Amino acid sequence: MQLGMVGLGRMGSNLARRLLPAGHECVVFDVNPSPVKELEAEGATGTGSLDELVEKLEKPRAVWVMVPAGQIAEQTVHDLGERLEPGDTIIDG
């Protein structure tokens, strides 16, 4: 299964690290490029923007959002909603 992961703090990066060895493809993004590079070294596909993340995901897309609750999460879900299409899924973690 292919999954987009937005937010690579402790929880998001550890989720991706658990999914990768189980054979899942993770396409990852974080505003901080460091954890993106770390996960690329572990087999994830890194991206530098939400646009690039959405572009690299196959339809129907599934994107797991692991950013802090509140305005940041609301804005991220809103921004993804503008880029995704009917049939795509956002998981707000």
Enumerate the predicted regions with their spans.
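NAD(P)+-binding Rossmann beta1-loop-alpha1 motif at the extreme N-terminus of oxidoreductases
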Residues: M1-V65, R83-G93
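Beta-loop-alpha module in the N-terminal Rossmann-like domain of NAD(P)-dependent dehydrogenases
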Residues: V65-D79
